């Protein structure tokens, strides 16, 4: 999984201007925090990894990478980001993981029966990210305008909904083996075909996934790959 994710990150992110010597004597810092959400009516645990240069380059702002399924994905993603940024393959990122161990389905998979868009608990989770989590991170940490969201299966599909807005809060999406919901291929293809925002989208699956996931992701890949829009940078990793 880690090797697989390294490939995805290299595809998604640009080459860093720093080299490994700049970061050699610096250490990463991790913070465990809690956000009290009015939308969710509960507390949510987050884990934050600060870039190695965060306490040295005090004027610098860093891309934010939000990791859904953070209870098991955070260490994979944050470790990969630190490794690749250390060697200068990608820029340093501030990584935040959102624990969804007991809330994964209600957070990401409650949809309207007709439109198949988020309702009730999933709509609330969407609002929590947009109106509470991101503002909290912006207020308390030095983050740049470029934000990436990472999800797997259910949360990977959920991450796509952020791209359906006129000015999406996330300009980068890493979609790992998404469980693609009804209408999502159509919604996503239509929106990305006409978007005026610069979007970086990376899609992945493998033959080790469930057959339905592999087939649906392959179909989505074909659809997105056919889009002719200079604002979309689309890459896929299917094997």
Language-model regions: role of each:
Residues 78, 131, 160-164:
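Short, hydrophobic alpha-helix immediately C-terminal to the catalytic nucleophile
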Residues 181-239:
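The feature captures the conserved acid-bearing segment of alpha/beta-hydrolase catalytic domains
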Residues 20-63:
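A domain-start/cap signature at the N-terminus of enzymes
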Residues 145-195:
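Primarily recognizes the serine-hydrolase "nucleophile elbow" in alpha/beta-hydrolase
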Residues 71-126:
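Active-site machinery of serine-nucleophile hydrolases
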Residues 62, 68-73:
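Active-site glycine-rich loops that stabilize anionic/oxyanionic intermediates
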Residues 111-153:
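Gly/Ser-rich "nucleophile elbow"/oxyanion-hole loop immediately N-terminal to the catalytic nucleophile
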Residues 1-25:
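Bacterial Sec-dependent N-terminal signal peptides
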């Amino acid at each position: 999984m880690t090797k697989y994710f390294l490939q995805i990150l290299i595809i998604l992110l640009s080459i860093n201007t720093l080299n490994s010597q700049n970061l050699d004597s610096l250490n990463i810092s991790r913070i465990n925090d809690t956000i009290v959400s009015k939308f969710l009516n509960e507390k949510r645990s987050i884990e934050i990894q600060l870039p190695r240069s965060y306490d040295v380059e005090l004027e610098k702002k860093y891309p934010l990478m939000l990791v859904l399924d953070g209870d098991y994905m955070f260490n994979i993603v944050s470790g990969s980001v630190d490794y690749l940024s250390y060697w200068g393959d990608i820029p340093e990122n501030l990584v935040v993981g959102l624990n969804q161990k007991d809330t994964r389905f209600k957070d990401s998979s409650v949809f309207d029966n007709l439109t198949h868009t988020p309702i009730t608990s999933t709509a609330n989770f969407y609002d929590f990210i947009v109106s509470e989590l991101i503002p909290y991170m912006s207020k308390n940490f030095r983050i740049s305008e470029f934000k990436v969201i990472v999800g797997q299966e259910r949360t990977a599909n959920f991450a796509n909904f952020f791209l359906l807005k006129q000015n999406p809060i996330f300009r980068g999406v890493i979609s790992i083996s998404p469980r693609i919901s009804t209408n999502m291929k159509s919604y996503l293809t239509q929106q990305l075909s006409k978007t005026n925002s610069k979007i970086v989208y990376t899609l992945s699956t493998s033959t080790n996934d469930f057959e339905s996931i592999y087939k649906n992701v392959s179909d989505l890949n074909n659809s997105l790959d056919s889009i002719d829009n200079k604002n979309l940078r689309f890459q896929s990793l299917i094997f």
